[in-house]
Amino acid sequence: MGERQTIADSKRAFHQAFPHVIAPLYRRLADELLVELHLLSHQSSFKTTPLFAVGLCTVFDTFSAGYRPEEHITGLLDALCSSNGYDANTFRKESKRCIDAAKTESVDAMDSHLAGQKLGEGSHYSRLMAIGVLRLFEEAKGDADQPDEADLRKRCKELSTALNFPAERVEKDLSLFASNSERMSAAIELVQETIAAERRKKERRQAEQAQRSES
């Protein structure tokens, strides 16, 4: 994207690429990622990395869970990326490649597995990179079916120096991601329960109307 691209330009391009109403529950996701990608696109020392791709796709998938209509989800990420000069399909492919590779590694082997992902000197760090590291730790083979998230976040922080990530920011970014994910999951569950309750009420009313019609 050119240096003159403003956030207003990015928003305009986004709405042209995705001319659909976004439910309030998901509007924050769209707004925050749009602004985040816009700012990164203008950061001269920022370069996309495989870990960034994993983190971006993880954040998007986490906070778009339950989105309806489901067929709009791919287009939403496409528009968020394209409006800022990025390609969502490239990120998706890179993310899948990294996750597939992580699944063949043990959790203890991930430090050496990720050694080649060190951020270059002077390169701009993004929270999405740290989230990408966490996701790969989650995908690695472990002894437990459900890995301890706090332990994995600790491992990510310990690895941050080797990856040339700011350790304190990594800890803060991962903690915030965890708390926001929990809140989003609870909100989605509440919405789904409300929809299910409304559906049951509607079905009861229809059944009662049918009984009255027959009597």
Curated annotation (Swiss-Prot):
It holds the Pfam family ThylakoidFormat. This is Protein Thf1. It comes from Synechococcus sp. (strain CC9902). One of its GO terms (cellular component) is plasma membrane-derived thylakoid photosystem II. GO terms for biological process: photosystem II assembly. PANTHER family: PROTEIN THYLAKOID FORMATION 1, CHLOROPLASTIC. Keywords: Coiled coil. InterPro entries: Thf1 (IPR017499). Belongs to the THF1 family. It comes from the Bacteria. May be involved in photosynthetic membrane biogenesis.
